[in-house]
């Protein structure tokens, strides 16, 4: 890779990292589940695009397989499956009123700053693109956790979990130029199995208490005690 190509690769990767992080912010403020799933699919598309660009720039052919797996699983299959459950359980009309939405968004911004603070010690020994990409990847992971904490619907928790995996996967692409293919296939299979199990879990909970609101589950636990 010559210097000009490397500079283009750096700019594109950092731009995609910023957009992936932006999608995590947008997911934080979403009250409608269908919109949340759509934004997650867009984040998956950006991740697949980043993987394909890394494969082309680094001449790493097995990253093309990773890009295809990401496209199939996180842009098509998993969003389709979650959307199907949302429609089947008639949750698409529900609007989740977020408590302290402004505070949640400020907390998300603080997590991005914290991510850069955590990675500050390695700035002297790492490249500009690596530090920024890793910081934004860590921010995506933390924002996914915040999404799970701030939303009440179990489906939003699943989307947050998948978003965390997106952040970890992007960090692996940037820092290691891609994991070994067998590891990537294993991770993709684990994500697929987790998505299917979550779908079964949704149906069982919905049939039991006719809701996927986590607050209702907590109240049931308090009554049992």
Q: What are the language-model segments listed below?
A:
Residues 1-225:
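Alpha-helical transmembrane segments of multi-pass membrane proteins predominantly involved
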């Amino acid at each position: 890779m010559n210097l000009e190509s490397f500079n283009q690769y750096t700019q594109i990767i950092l731009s995609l990292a910023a957009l992936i992080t932006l999608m995590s912010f947008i997911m934080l403020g979403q009250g409608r589940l269908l919109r949340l799933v759509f934004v997650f699919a867009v984040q998956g598309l950006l991740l697949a695009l980043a993987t394909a660009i890394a494969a082309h720039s680094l001449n790493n052919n097995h990253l093309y397989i990773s890009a295809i797996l990401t496209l199939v699983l996180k842009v098509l299959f998993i969003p389709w499956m979650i959307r199907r459950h949302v429609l089947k359980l008639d949750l698409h009309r529900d609007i989740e009123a977020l408590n302290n939405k402004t505070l949640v968004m400020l907390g998300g911004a603080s997590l991005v700053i914290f991510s850069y603070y955590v990675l500050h010690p390695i700035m002297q020994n790492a490249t500009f693109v690596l530090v920024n990409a890793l910081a934004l990847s860590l921010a995506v992971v933390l924002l996914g956790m915040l999404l799970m904490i701030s939303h009440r619907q179990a489906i939003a928790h699943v989307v947050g979990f998948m978003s965390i995996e997106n952040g970890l996967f992007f960090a692996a692409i940037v820092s290691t130029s891609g994991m070994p293919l067998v590891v990537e296939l294993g991770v993709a299979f684990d994500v697929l199995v987790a998505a299917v199990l979550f779908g079964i879990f949704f149906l069982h909970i919905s049939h039991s208490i006719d809701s996927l609101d986590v607050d209702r589950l907590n109240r049931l636990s308090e009554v049992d005690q």
